[in-house]
Amino acid sequence: MVVYLTHWFRQEDRGKAVAMFMAAIPVSNAIGAPVAGLLLRLHWLGISGWRWLLILEGVPALLGGVVALFYLTDRPKEARWLTGEEKDWISGELGKEKGKTHGHGDMLAALRQPFVWALALAYFLINTSGYGLNIWLPKMVQKFAGLTTFEVSLVVAIPFAVSVPAMLLAGWHSDKTGERRWHAALAAITAGLGLALSQLVNGNPVLIIASFSIAAVGIMSFYPTYWAMATGLLSARSAAAGFGFVNLIANFGGFVGPYMVGYLTDRTGTYAAGVYSLVATALLSAVVLIAMRHRKPAAVGVALNPDVLVP
């Protein structure tokens, strides 16, 4: 989807564009958590609540995919809902950026670039923290607050709801300043600090939720600024291969984060060790980004700008 956005938005607008697109993640979590709590209580037509949850939340997603298939187009010039002037302007602006690329792009060319591996590592680390928090947050809330399943779903929605405006603001500010790397790094640091703070507030439920909200703000603000940076480092031809590799590595964080928290919780009998492991991965993600530096790109078709960030 990020590659698709590069076909529609200029580099200078991609922070806002990615933020608006990815804001669907915390919005869906904020709305979906309490809705799921309600659906789990249903017992219609002899069908249990968890089955209704899958049906009523799965069908709209399928319908949305069908609508997108027939409504969205690959390129602006194919969009029937744009005027000719709008199509020409978008194509012209994106054409200027394509003119800055060098050589050709393929999977091997992308993988030969150290910054692609650095991008993958940074994304893997923040995903480890994000998925670890997302999966275990309901259980942690239920333990320290002693709430019902529905009450837990309402509380869990708070961090995600708070993160939405912060995410949009991060994307907007990154576009306004033209700075990407430090925006993403500071977001990862914020996530780590929020997670650490949750273990230092002496079990106060309000402060724990506030701390997790800070962590969610950091994690969700990372995504638009990170992807705005990444789309400026890979040419259009290399983007699909490069981003595919980045996502391949990063998605392992969806396994490592929850498993790591569960394992450490079982070994220690407390969530603290697991949460601190998420602190470590968030801060390491920031370290990877901060360690990247400016260098002139080699003409192998992966650089979009004359100055890119590589380790």
Regions found by a protein language model. Give the residues of each.
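Symmetry-related core transmembrane helices of the 12-TM Major Facilitator Superfamily/SLC fold
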Residues: 51-70, 275-290
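Intracellular juxtamembrane helix-capping segments at the cytosolic ends
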Residues: 1-9, 221-234
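Glycine-rich segments within core transmembrane alpha-helices of 12-TM secondary carriers
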Residues: 15-38, 44, 60-61, 247-257
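C-terminal transmembrane helical hairpin of 12-TM major facilitator-type secondary transporters
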Residues: 180-229
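Cytoplasmic helix-loop-helix junction between adjacent transmembrane helices
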Residues: 1-23
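Helix-to-loop junctions at the C-terminal end of transmembrane segments
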Residues: 40, 166-179, 265-266
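A late C-terminal transmembrane helix in Major Facilitator Superfamily
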Residues: 231-270, 278
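Extracytoplasmic gate region of multi-pass secondary transporters
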Residues: 108-171, 223, 227, 257-258
